[in-house]
């Protein structure tokens, strides 16, 4: 049985307090006219109802997205920006986002050195305007008062799209590959597992993964780290690319332009964006400025749209 359609609750009025709303609900539930918190009562529920509500929907999503149109690895600022553009441009596409962390957002919850404000160089403010994030205009750059405002807004916008599913606390352990008639490698999906399982392959055995097929993947896993630069490191180990360039030292002026310009399909079926690119090309790191992450995601989405029909046809062969 399909879950019921989502219901959006609207406040009683701009002056309504939490107690007013509780009172209205309690009148419906208990027929009580008491206007106090002491009369408050939740609707009844059984524990198994909660379990079934969660598990049924999750396994329906696993079934639905086992064949996806696009898989995005990494739900940082670049991956979420790509998901937003794709979902808005092509509501017919099934888009699965796979994020190793419990909390999506990557490093975009704070600015540099755990400070609050987020800096973006122009013209990245156009993306802020698109998703409805207010900012202070400082001439050549803009400042969002707290990085979490950008990340939470972008995340909520993405998750509202009916054609997007976020699988967080889920790691990509490998890439699904195919070869064409000429023997050239093409990426055709991802191999997944619970992140906590992925972290314990050294001390536990026989923990096989799951898979998601898709004609094209966007990898935005960040610079080198435990889960970072995953896809491009895997390409090296399977001899699909010769070696990584290695991220260079910090140069904001060079780094942001390079990341956006070089966002591309590295091998057929795999588009790479964000700081993962710096490991491929030997680009500079950019430090605590976030415009390139957002716009690299936008370009990654546009790149997918350009090649999607071709990759989908190949995926059916």
Curated annotation (Swiss-Prot):
Report the co-factor binding details: Binds 1 Fe cation per subunit.
The main enzyme category here is transferase
Under which EC number(s) is this enzyme classified? 2.4.2.60
* Pfam family for this entry, one: Thi4
**What residues does substrate bind to?**
78, 99-100, 107, 172, 208, 223, 275, 285-287
The prosthetic group or cofactor this protein requires is: Fe cation
For this protein, what post-translational modification is recorded in UniProt? During the catalytic reaction, a sulfide is transferred from Cys-206 to a reaction intermediate, generating a dehydroalanine residue.
Write out the catalysed reaction.
[ADP-thiazole synthase]-L-cysteine + glycine + NAD(+) = [ADP-thiazole synthase]-dehydroalanine + ADP-5-ethyl-4-methylthiazole-2-carboxylate + nicotinamide + 3 H2O + 2 H(+)
Signal peptide: which range, if any? none
Q: Which UniProt keywords apply?
A: Cytoplasm, Iron, Metal-binding, NAD, Nucleus, Thiamine biosynthesis, Transferase
Any one Gene Ontology MF annotation carried by this entry is: cysteine-dependent adenosine diphosphate thiazole synthase activity
Q: Where in the cell is it found?
A: Cytoplasm; Nucleus
Q: What does this protein do?
A: Involved in biosynthesis of the thiamine precursor thiazole. Catalyzes the conversion of NAD and glycine to adenosine diphosphate 5-(2-hydroxyethyl)-4-methylthiazole-2-carboxylic acid (ADT), an adenylated thiazole intermediate. The reaction includes an iron-dependent sulfide transfer from a conserved cysteine residue of the protein to a thiazole intermediate. The enzyme can only undergo a single turnover, which suggests it is a suicide enzyme. May have additional roles in adaptation to various stress conditions and in DNA damage tolerance.
> Under what name is this protein listed?
Thiamine thiazole synthase
Protein species of origin: Yarrowia lipolytica (strain CLIB 122 / E 150) (Yeast)
What does the record give as the organism's lineage?
A: Eukaryota, Fungi, Dikarya, Ascomycota, Saccharomycotina
């Amino acid at each position: 049985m399909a879950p019921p359609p989502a219901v959006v609750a609207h406040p009683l009025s701009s002056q309504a307090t939490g107690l007013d709303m509780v009172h209205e609900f309690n009148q419906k539930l208990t027929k009580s006219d008491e206007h106090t918190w002491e009369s408050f009562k939740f609707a009844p529920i059984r524990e198994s109802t909660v379990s079934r509500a969660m598990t049924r929907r999750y396994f329906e999503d696993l079934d639905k997205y086992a064949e996806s149109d696009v898989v995005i690895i990494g739900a940082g600022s670049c991956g979420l920006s790509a998901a937003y553009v794709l979902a808005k441009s092509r509501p017919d596409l099934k888009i699965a986002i796979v994020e190793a962390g419990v909390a999506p957002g990557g490093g975009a919850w704070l600015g540099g050195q755990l400070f609050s404000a987020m800096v973006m160089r122009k013209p990245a403010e156009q993306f802020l305007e698109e998703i409805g994030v207010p900012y202070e205009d400082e001439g050549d750059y803009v400042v969002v008062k707290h990085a979490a405002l950008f990340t939470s807004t972008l995340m909520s916008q993405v998750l509202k799209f009916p054609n997007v599913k976020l699988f967080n606390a889920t790691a990509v352990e490998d890439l699904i590959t195919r070869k064409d008639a000429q023997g050239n490698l093409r990426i055709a999906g991802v191999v997944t597992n619970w992140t906590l399982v992925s972290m314990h392959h050294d001390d536990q055995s026989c923990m096989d993964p799951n898979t998601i097929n898709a004609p094209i993947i966007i990898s935005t896993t960040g610079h080198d780290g435990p889960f970072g630069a995953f896809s491009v490191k895997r390409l090296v180990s399977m001899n699909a690319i010769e070696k990584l360039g290695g991220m260079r030292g910090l140069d904001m002026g060079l780094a942001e332009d390079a990341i956006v310009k070089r966002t591309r399909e590295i091998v057929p079926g795999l588009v790479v964006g964000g700081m993962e690119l710096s490991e491929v090309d030997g680009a500079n790191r950019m430090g605590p400025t976030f415009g390139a992450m957002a716009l690299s995601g936008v370009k990654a989405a546009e790149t997918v749209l350009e090649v999607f029909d071709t990759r989908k046809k190949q995926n059916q062969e």
